[in-house]
């Protein structure tokens, strides 16, 4: 097993002949977040699953704080994974920050991506002049302070807010588990990198077709953000806002989300 495979807990499942699908999870989760989607893909596709560096199941000794201080570090990891597996072209499904990571990777290697399915994606979380990302700087400062002072307590409060449900729901409990599995100092560093990121200037450079999918109600991504992506991406794009709630709809509302994702995976944008 190569260092890339080991570091990212790389798994390839399915023997399908319709091509390769790469599933990339967002902050606070790991590859298990795709458990409701994978069974629908394995008959038709080869499915690549991995954990982003810093996620709970990864070795914290491999987490390089300077490399992952920007999203480009994660994009380089993604390209290394595709190289390791000798993937010539893939359909990439990225959730949350991994949607943006896939978009960044596609700028330097558009040939590797036939399409990007961007679930709950945002190019910037902070509000700005003529831009509504959903957060003010003081909101983020409070979030970082809470993470730093008592990480376990923060997880318990953040999970239901993010997922959109009470602590008793299976999805909230699952997200709480994967969130709490991350080493606290790594979690804080990753959260700071994500929430302070701004990739708006890169969007016109993304020429691969993009399928933008999000919940009607999402604590982290207002619906107007999807319209912003649609307007500023450099290639063809389409937006679908689902009647779901929360930032992890593939976990909390699989009955709504899985059919939508499958449709965007299987059908291209009609030009």
Swiss-Prot record:
Keywords: Cytoplasm, Hydrolase, Nucleus. The active site is at 96 (nucleophile), 218, 247. Gene3D superfamilies: alpha/beta hydrolase. SUPFAM superfamilies: alpha/beta-Hydrolases. GO terms for cellular component: cytoplasm; nucleus. InterPro entries: AB_hydrolase_1, AB_hydrolase_fold. GO terms for biological process: arbuscular mycorrhizal association; response to karrikin. It is found in: Nucleus; Cytoplasm. Expressed constitutively in all organs (e.g. roots, stems, leaves, panicles and embryos). It holds the Pfam family Abhydrolase_6. Its main location: nucleus. Disruption phenotype: Loss of responsiveness to and symbiosis with the arbuscular mycorrhizal fungi (AMF) Rhizophagus irregularis and Gigaspora rosea characterized by the absence of physical contact and of characteristic transcriptional responses to fungal signals. GO terms for molecular function: hydrolase activity. Disulfide bonds: none annotated. Belongs to the AB hydrolase superfamily. Component of an intracellular receptor complex involved in the detection of the smoke compound karrikin. May be involved in strigolactone signaling pathway. Essential for plant responses to karrikins, a class of butenolide compounds, structurally similar to strigolactones, released from burning vegetation that stimulate seed germination and enhance seedling photomorphogenesis. Mediates a specific perception of karrikin. Required for the establishment of symbiosis with the arbuscular mycorrhizal fungi (AMF) Rhizophagus irregularis and Gigaspora rosea. Karrikin binding induces a conformational change. This is Probable esterase D14L. It comes from Oryza sativa subsp. japonica. The gene is D14L.
